[in-house]
Amino acid sequence: YNFCTNYLAGDMSPKKYWKFKEPYEGIHKLDKRIEKNLELVEKFVQLGVPRKHIIISGHSCGGLLTLMLLAAHPDKVGGGISYMQACYGKLSKKYKVKKVGPEEALAKFAKKYPGGAELRQRQINNIKKSSNVPVLAFTHPKDQYEGLLSDWLEEVPGVKRIIISEDFKINKKTCVMKGKDWEENISKQKSPGHKMNQADCFQFYNPLK
């Protein structure tokens, strides 16, 4: 559902995404998505679904949205699952986090896109301010987006972070992505670390009985 709300645009130009230098003014599209998700939650509750049985989940930008929603409204649902939260491009890869470290990499990002960097940090700070964020957060160190910029999750009360693996296997099982008439080792995909939750090996975290 998070991705079905792509028609929602923030108050600033939707074409800018994070590539703006001025401080973000108005309501960001992620905040608008939160409101739409909360509206959907209330519809389910009105149909008789217990709040504690409703779990919000999202991948990438949807993963960040999940964290933001649960930080602001921890009692509205039973909890959340965030997969590879990221909404500001391939920061780990582009700014060479592994080589220069998070601090220097984020400083370079802030120099190039001060508005985007400020908004990202503001969102993180708001999440960290919450007294309880009941979210299971999956990250991968080889995620080109924020794989090496996710340690802040360890500071968020209520968040349980799972670092999936150090390579493209889970529990020694090779990870394969499958479609209707194709399958491919995830290591051959673009941004494989960002897609680990879409591979068959990820079933390890939700074993079939």
Task: Please give the residue ranges for each predicted region.
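Cap/lid segment of the alpha/beta-hydrolase catalytic domain
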Residues: 4-31
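Structural recognition of the beta-strand scaffold that forms the well-ordered cores
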Residues: 1-5, 53-57, 79-83, 135-138, ...
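Solvent-exposed, acidic/flexible segments
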Residues: 27-34, 59, 63, 116, ...
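C-terminal catalytic histidine-bearing segment of alpha/beta-hydrolase fold enzymes
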Residues: 157-209
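Primarily recognizes the serine-hydrolase "nucleophile elbow" in alpha/beta-hydrolase
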Residues: 43, 47, 52-100
